[in-house]
């Protein structure tokens, strides 16, 4: 039974019902419907912390989905799972792939910045200030891109850029 048919969450059920109606009304191919079903089931599994199941659904959706914009969101969600699992190198790879297909994803730039900032903090703890600065510089570049796409978002990142003197390089 597809995950969407066994969902107990009210919001997910509502989303599923609306999505099913839209799939019937909007002209789409069977392949597109199947890809969306896998994507929807992946989101449902991901929201419940069932990451292995979510990844399986996302990979199936990727095999079927041909639209670059839609693929970007699948790749982004795969990146989220790898981030949650602490697999930062993989997460960065998937966020990059998402941005190749859709360069207007500020949340992907933000998540990449957060990972780089985290790695910078780790380098400080390991006594490696040079590596730390490189990671922080990379985080700054990603945050600048996120802020350029969504200027009213990422206030903490904007403050960090100001405090660390990285904002004036950009303005």
From Swiss-Prot:
Cell compartments where the protein resides: Plastid, Chloroplast thylakoid membrane
Keyword Ion transport (UniProt): no
SMART domains for this protein: TPR
Signal peptide span: none
Keywords: Chloroplast, Membrane, Photosynthesis, Plastid, Repeat, Thylakoid, TPR repeat
UniProt xrefs under InterPro entries: PSI_Ycf3_assembly (IPR022818), TPR-like_helical_dom_sf (IPR011990), TPR_rpt (IPR019734), Ycf3/AcsC/BcsC/TPR_MFPF (IPR051685)
Tagged with keyword Thylakoid: yes
Source domain of life: Eukaryota
Function: Essential for the assembly of the photosystem I (PSI) complex. May act as a chaperone-like factor to guide the assembly of the PSI subunits.
Family per similarity comment: Belongs to the Ycf3 family.
Protein's UniProt name: Photosystem I assembly protein Ycf3
Species, as recorded: Angiopteris evecta (Mule's foot fern)
GN (gene name): ycf3
């Amino acid at each position: 039974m597809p995950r969407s048919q066994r969902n107990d969450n009210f919001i997910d059920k509502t989303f599923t019902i609306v999505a099913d109606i839209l799939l019937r009304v909007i002209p789409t191919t069977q392949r597109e419907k199947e890809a969306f079903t896998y994507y929807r089931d992946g989101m449902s599994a991901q929201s419940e912390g069932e990451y292995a199941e979510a990844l399986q659904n996302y990979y199936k959706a990727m095999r079927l989905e041909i639209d670059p914009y839609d693929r970007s969101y699948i790749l982004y969600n795969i990146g989220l799972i790898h981030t949650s699992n602490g697999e930062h190198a993989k997460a960065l790879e998937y966020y990059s792939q998402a941005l190749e297909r859709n360069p207007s994803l500020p949340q992907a730039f933000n998540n990449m910045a957060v990972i780089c900032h985290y790695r910078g903090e780790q380098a400080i703890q390991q006594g490696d200030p040079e590596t730390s600065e490189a990671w922080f510089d990379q985080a700054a570049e990603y945050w600048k891109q996120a802020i350029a796409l969504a200027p009213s978002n990422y206030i903490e990142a904007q403050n960090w850029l100001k405090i660390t003197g990285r904002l004036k390089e950009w303005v």
